[in-house]
Amino acid sequence: MKVFDFPAIVSGDSPPQQFFGFPLFFLREMVYNGFIDYLTRMAAMRILYDSKQSQFKTPFGTLTPGQTCTLNIHIPASVLTTKVTCIFNNEDGSWAQSVEMAYRMKKGAYDIFQGRFSIPYPGLFFYYFYIDTKNGGFRLFKQGDDTNMEAGDLWQLSCVPADFTTPDWAKGATIYQVFPDRFHSAGRVHTEGKLEPYTLHKSWYEEVDWKPTAEGQVLNNDFFGGNFRGITEKMDYIASLGVTILYLNPISKSFSSHRYDTGDYKTPDPMLGTEADFSDMCRAAHARGIRVVLDGVYSHTGSNSLYFNREKAFPSVGAYNSKESPYYSWYTFYDWPDTYHSWWDFDTLPTVNKMDPAFIRYIITDEDSVVAHWLKLGADGYRLDVADELPDEFLRLLRDRVKQLKPDALLLGEVWEDASNKCAYGKRRTYFTGGELDSVMNYPFRTAILNFIKNLDGGRGFKETVMSIVENYPPQVVACNMNLLGTHDTPRILTALVDDFDGSREEKAKRHLSRNQLTVAVERLEMASFLQYTLPGSPSLYYGDEAGMEGYKDPFNRRTYPWGREDPELLTHFRRLGRLRKGNEVLRQGDIQFFQAEDRRVGFTRTYNGKTLRVYCNRSGDPWDIPSGKILLGHNLHTIAPDWLTLSPKGFCVTEEWK
């Protein structure tokens, strides 16, 4: 949280005297002792506090109500500190606490002050320090991993419910995301009952239909016939990647190929198959230790749906057809029937009133509600589309019902930013402090990995992003985080790593990576995916990325899987990563600590149950000599001495410390 004009809480009757944000006693020293001497003294007066290090704060990360937290701040003795106060506030100012920190000890040139406190209830809190000295007082704020006087950020501290748990099977899992129409087709493609018009491609390897209609509409109504049986047929292939969670994009009956325009929540799209086919797929997955997670699209429906029925393709009386429709209250009409609230102004996606009692009954609470229906058929959880648009009250009702039906079901939300402090539509969300979501899509990790791999960051930004998420999220959420590099909403990762082209759809359809670009992209993807699979959380592989698929954003990131045309070396690389992670509990569950994050080199440890792994990535142009250990996986790695290894440029490895 950025500080702009945050009021200070100070001791005594008089506020600190400041000039342009600096305490006057420092400015007086500038005058009395000279500018150079002032700068020297300021450099020597660096105050030490980093909430991510145990010497300054324990426990690490989030708290539960009533749990004791200990803070230690190191202040140079030359500051002549007389009192240190840590000031906590919740966001709306309804709760505040001032913790006076006691002098603990002197360590070298530093005085160490310590304070202990607890927080009474779940919520999001922020804090800073006020330091009294013999010459005056000043506030201390956060600046990256460092501190800064009178300007900067507040430290964040989340308090989560003590009974907030997440599914054990989802912790450290490996996820495989499938866009159902484009993965694999088996048997006859059923078109009976399919919403019209549609196009069925004659060849699996044809280009996706990217051209708009004569009226300028993009219909997304071209299909290749991927289905449940096709996924079942390829379940051994999916398992060979070390996958433990299969996440499917929407499967309900819909007009489009992406199926985010739901037509009938409780009916599978005819082209995908029947409910029996779906259950068979789930059983095949479960037999291989793979759970099935579905896409829950509860922010909007399709205009061509059982509920809205603008196109009159359903026998029901939809909200568009009559104000007496049982679904009329689901929607907001400004001028019925043609003017209504729609998702991002797409008139084919009318937005629903999430807290409408009839909608809640249909989706959540009825005996055969939508969430109950698919769980009974074999699903193990839901990824919630545009979670930011689902009210916290809706999410709590949904969680209660899902956990009642299947206590270890997974609820994963689509959130693009730091979900611990996310503000959406003017409201701070309570995904974790309210115990609503088990996990979220970890787009911040994706950004951090891409910036490091593309040499836009030397390593420090990567470390700051990773540790910020790990600190801000409860550990049970961190372990379930969906760590992705590519999805149906991003360019293919191979393309994203080397080509930021942003031309027209026609240009993108014709544009492909050159041989040189592809070589660089594959090299970068190998290291990016290595980081993805060695960080805390659950790596997620978008179908076909392991095969070398390329393409820009929708629809070019949704081409068909290239069966028989895969990149064999890349496929082997991802299988190795899958085996590494599946066979190593330290990577699935371990804590993380960085020991290197600059000069285009990243190094961190993963520790669990007394075992430590060391992870190295070298993006620099020079070799990196590292301590020897048991090599679990390595690339461009050489032994130079019994106790030392050399990691060449563009090399990466993970080693287990010798006992």
Where are these regions (language model features)?
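Aromatic/acidic polysaccharide-binding cleft in carbohydrate-active enzymes
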Residues: 181, 425-426, 432, 438-439, ...
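Active-site-proximal helices and loops of the catalytic beta/alpha 8
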Residues: 282-291, 299-300, 305-316, 380, ...
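Short, positively charged and aromatic/hydrophobic N-terminal segments
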Residues: 9-12, 28-41
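Substrate-binding/active-site clefts of carbohydrate-active enzymes
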Residues: 179-245, 251-376, 398-405
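Cationic, low-complexity basic patches in intrinsically disordered or flexible, solvent-exposed regions
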Residues: 18-19
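Carbohydrate-interacting/catalytic domains
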Residues: 40-174, 179, 185, 191-194, ...
